[in-house]
């Protein structure tokens, strides 16, 4: 008799919701189907878009006989790390000029978050202090909870962010949570285009947030996944991070180049570290190097080369910013068109929040029954939270989606 597998007691994990949604969409034979769940840019033909500047740089790399496939340094491609941190902080950043900034190339934004979380769990607020509270917004990108718990943090809390009644930022709730958090707590902040709500604090509100965080000795860990992709303006989307640096904060900023370069499967990320003096950066990076060594050891080169080539060449950089604006403008257009159609249909409720939000996602305010109706009856795939990816909308499906939302809201109040 054969003995049972040693893995017989391993339970089946639940699928990752957003990827299951895409799998269900692909298997659906209905010709009307629309995927509003995918977290990637799509053209008006609902196709992935390789940025023209990326195509150009890929060709340059392919034709460069001096490049090879040797290991990159553990911390990554130096030119990429430098360019990425400069993009986040700005060319005129005093922190850069004073050499108190460091970067770690990572496997996407998730990898940057994980390296930062692993470092903080070992060296922040006391050695190996896994009890430091980590605050994530309510709601947030679901991976934030998993990354910090996976790094060993035992006390992950939520802070007020979304006001469902007014469909906007709950600033007072946010500030109250900052005031009541234990000193030295870690706060995960969305640099721009908050996921999933698409609602960001204004500069004045960010100043209030920073003021309380400074007084309470709270540590800002920014997640910057959409720089340039949110408003179409790189500097505007980096405003919050740069303001915190100007206020003297030490901070981490996890950067992703998946969205603004369209390099989803290249996994290009960077963890920017800002400290108070250069010596601290050297020591922090030395410890991060040890963490990277036992995580992925050395990062991949292709995506980092594409980003570094583009950001370091004035002509390519200008072309890239144009490509980014093309994507941002299409999203803004879809927001305006969807709102206009819902208001023309006199769909119950208010829909101004759709155009007031920014970035790839809109937190529609649709309830679970309305979402269930859209998925099961109308073949429009979106998350149970009501979050939709504006890139899934096109001039061809806008009328169908708007009419379907109108039906869902009318049937299920």
Curated annotation (Swiss-Prot):
Subcellular location(s) per record: Cytoplasm
Phosphoserine, modified sites: 149
Phosphoprotein listed as a keyword: yes
CDD domains, alphabetized: AAT_like (cd00609)
Cofactors named for this entry: pyridoxal 5'-phosphate
Matches recorded under InterPro entries: Aminotransferase_I/II_large, Asp_trans, NHTrfase_class1_PyrdxlP-BS, PyrdxlP-dep_Trfase, PyrdxlP-dep_Trfase_major, PyrdxlP-dep_Trfase_small
PROSITE patterns given in the database record: AA_TRANSFER_CLASS_1
Chief subcellular location: cytoplasm
Residues involved in L-aspartate binding: 39, 141, 195, 387
Gene Ontology MF, one: pyridoxal phosphate binding
EC number: 2.6.1.1, 2.6.1.3
Entries under NCBIfam families matching the protein: PRK09257.1
Note: In eukaryotes there are cytoplasmic, mitochondrial and chloroplastic isozymes.
Entry similarity comment: Belongs to the class-I pyridoxal-phosphate-dependent aminotransferase family.
Subunit structure as annotated in this protein's UniProt entry: Homodimer.
The protein's name: Aspartate aminotransferase, cytoplasmic
Organism: Equus caballus (Horse)
Gene name of the record: GOT1
């Amino acid at each position: 008799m054969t003995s049972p597998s040693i893995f017989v007691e391993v339970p089946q994990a639940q699928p990752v919701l957003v990827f299951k949604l895409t799998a269900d969409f692909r298997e659906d034979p209905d010709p009307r189907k629309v995927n509003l769940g995918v977290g990637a840019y799509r053209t008006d033909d609902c196709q992935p878009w390789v940025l023209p500047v990326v195509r150009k740089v890929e060709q340059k790399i392919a034709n460069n006989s001096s490049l090879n496939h040797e290991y990159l340094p553990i911390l990554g491609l130096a030119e990429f790390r430098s360019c990425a941190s400069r993009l986040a902080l700005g060319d005129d950043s005093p922190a850069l000029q004073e050499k108190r900034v460091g970067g770690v190339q990572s496997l996407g934004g998730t990898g940057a978050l994980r390296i930062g979380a692993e470092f903080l769990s070992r060296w922040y607020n006391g050695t190996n202090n896994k009890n430091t509270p980590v605050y994530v917004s309510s709601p947030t990108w679901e991976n934030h909870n998993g990354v910090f718990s996976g790094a060993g943090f035992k006390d992950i809390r939520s802070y007020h962010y979304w006001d469902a009644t007014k469909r906007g930022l709950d600033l007072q709730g946010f500030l109250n949570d900052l005031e009541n958090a234990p000193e030295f707590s870690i706060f995960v902040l969305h640099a721009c285009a908050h996921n999933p709500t698409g609602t960001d604090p204004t500069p004045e509100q960010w100043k209030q947030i920073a003021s309380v965080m400074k007084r309470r000795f709270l540590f800002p860990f920014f997640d910057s996944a959409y720089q340039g992709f949110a408003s179409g303006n790189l500097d505007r989307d980096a405003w919050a991070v740069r303001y915190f640096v100007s206020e003297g904060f030490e901070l981490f900023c996890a950067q992703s180049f998946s969205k603004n370069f369209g390099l989803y499967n290249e996994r290009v990320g960077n963890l920017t570290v800002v400290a108070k003096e250069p010596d601290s950066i050297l020591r922090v990076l030395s410890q991060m190097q040890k963490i990277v060594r036992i995580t992925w050891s050395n990062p991949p080169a292709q995506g980092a080369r594409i980003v570094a080539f583009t950001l370091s060449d004035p002509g390519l950089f200008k072309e890239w910013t144009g490509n980014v604006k093309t994507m941002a403008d299409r999203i803004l257009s879809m927001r305006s068109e969807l709102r206009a159609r819902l208001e023309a249909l006199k769909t119950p409720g208010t829909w101004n929040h759709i155009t007031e939000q920014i970035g790839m996602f809109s937190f529609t305010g649709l309830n679970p029954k309305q979402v269930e109706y859209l998925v099961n009856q109308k073949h429009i795939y979106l998350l149970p939270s009501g979050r939709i990816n504006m890139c899934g909308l096109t001039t061809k499906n806008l009328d169908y989606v708007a009419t379907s939302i109108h039906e869902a809201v009318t049937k299920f109040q």
